Amino acid sequence: MARIAGVNIPTAKRVVIALTYIHGIGPKFAQEIVEKVGIPAERRVHQLTDAEVLQIREAIDRDYQVEGDLRRETAMNIKRLMDLGCYRGLRHRRGLPVRGQRTHTNARTRKGPAKAIAGKKK
C-alpha cells in the first residue's frame, strides 16, 4: 500500500480514484496531478514505481494544501469568524445553518436530534 500525504492509498484502484482518498484532493485535482506527473490515467496504484510515487508525493506537497494543514486552516477560518462576532460566526457558535437555510422546520442535521418540549401535547 502506497502512503502519500500521510494516507494509505488503496492499491487495487486506479491512481486518479485512489488520490481522492486524500482530504483536499477531489477528482479534478487528482486528474491534474496525474497529468502533471505524466502517469497514464488507467494505471493502478500497485503498478506504480517508487519513482512515480515520489513524483506524486512531491507534486502534492508543492502545489496543494492537504490533510492536516487543510483541516487546520478550515478550523482557524471558522474560529476567526466566531472571534469576530459576525453573523456567520454566531451561526457557527450556536450550531445553526450558516448559509441562509430555513430553521423553522428542517435543519435537523445541524441542530441535532429533536428535543421534546413540555406542554406541547395535544
Swiss-Prot record:
Classification via PROSITE patterns: RIBOSOMAL_S13_1, RIBOSOMAL_S13_2
What top-level branch of life does the organism fall under? Bacteria
Gene3D superfamilies attached to this UniProt entry: 1.10.8.50, 30s ribosomal protein s13, domain 2 (4.10.910.10)
Where does the record place the region Disordered?
Answer: 99-122
A GO cellular component annotated for this chain's UniProt record is: small ribosomal subunit
List residues traversing the bilayer. none
Pfam families attached to this UniProt entry: Ribosomal_S13 (PF00416)
**Alphabetically ordered keywords of this record:** Ribonucleoprotein, Ribosomal protein, RNA-binding, rRNA-binding, tRNA-binding
Share what the entry says about its subunit structure, partners included: Part of the 30S ribosomal subunit. Forms a loose heterodimer with protein S19. Forms two bridges to the 50S subunit in the 70S ribosome.
Q: Which family does it belong to?
A: Belongs to the universal ribosomal protein uS13 family.
What's the stated role of this polypeptide?
Located at the top of the head of the 30S subunit, it contacts several helices of the 16S rRNA. In the 70S ribosome it contacts the 23S rRNA (bridge B1a) and protein L5 of the 50S subunit (bridge B1b), connecting the 2 subunits; these bridges are implicated in subunit movement. Contacts the tRNAs in the A and P-sites.
What PANTHER family does the record tag this protein with? 30S RIBOSOMAL PROTEIN S13/40S RIBOSOMAL PROTEIN S18, SMALL RIBOSOMAL SUBUNIT PROTEIN US13M
Q: What is this protein called?
A: Small ribosomal subunit protein uS13
Per the UniProt entry, what species is this protein from, by scientific name? Answer: Rhizobium etli (strain CIAT 652)
The gene that this protein is the product of is rpsM
